[in-house]
Amino acid sequence: MADAKELKQVLIGPIVSNNPIALQILGVCSALAVTSKMETALVMTIALTAVCALSNLFISLIRNHIPSSVRIIVQMTIIASLVIVVDQVLQAYAYDVAKQLSVFVGLIITNCIVMGRAEAYAMKTPPMMSFMDGIGNGLGYGAILLSVGFVRELFGNGSLFGIEILSKISDGGWYQPNGLLLLPPSAFFLIGALIWIIRVMKPEQVEAKG
């Protein structure tokens, strides 16, 4: 049984020191597509965290009974089933957001973070640790999404969660929104800037040369 210190490290590590996007450069494609608004970034964070945590838990519970030759198929079946459930819940209770997220909820099944944690961690680790690892990696993914979404929506549209924060010139205010921030390439540059800032602050994350 894992102690509290180990559980805390597994939960906090992916958010701070081993972020799946900032350090491992995983899950970048969806991060580019769903961060034009805080609302979509938050819902995608919740969806991926739920899938990652629950898939880790279920895979860990049956890890000793999965033949090595079919382990990837079993993992993908579990992940796909959870993605279908999450997608149906969103369709039922957050239809407008589900439409905005489009295919990206369904594509969680191919997300490198979810598949990577299932194979590299859940297959070798007890259920509780695997569950916490899934939550930690989901929150680490979400931290980057929400940071990028905050900048893009605030300065690209003058709002947060659809609520006007900066009064726009078109409405008689003072702020001229930067439409470039709402385009997908801006997310790429913002994520790159975040990675650079993190590695300046944490030099140990810079890859060794040679």
Curated annotation (Swiss-Prot):
Its EC number is 7.2.1.1. One of its GO terms (cellular component) is plasma membrane. GO terms for molecular function: oxidoreductase activity, acting on NAD(P)H, quinone or similar compound as acceptor. The keyword Cell membrane applies. InterPro entries: NqrD (IPR011292), NqrDE/RnfAE (IPR003667). GO terms for biological process: sodium ion transport. Keywords: Cell inner membrane, Cell membrane, Ion transport, Membrane, NAD, Sodium, Sodium transport, Translocase, Transmembrane, Transmembrane helix, Transport, Ubiquinone. It is a multi-pass membrane protein. It catalyses: a ubiquinone + n Na(+)(in) + NADH + H(+) = a ubiquinol + n Na(+)(out) + NAD(+). The chain crosses the membrane at residues 10-30, 42-62, 72-92, 103-123, 131-151, 178-198. It is found in: Cell inner membrane. PANTHER family: ELECTRON TRANSPORT COMPLEX PROTEIN RNFE, NA(+)-TRANSLOCATING NADH-QUINONE REDUCTASE SUBUNIT D. NQR complex catalyzes the reduction of ubiquinone-1 to ubiquinol by two successive reactions, coupled with the transport of Na(+) ions from the cytoplasm to the periplasm. NqrA to NqrE are probably involved in the second step, the conversion of ubisemiquinone to ubiquinol. Belongs to the NqrDE/RnfAE family. Composed of six subunits; NqrA, NqrB, NqrC, NqrD, NqrE and NqrF. This is Na(+)-translocating NADH-quinone reductase subunit D. It comes from Shewanella pealeana (strain ATCC 700345 / ANG-SQ1).
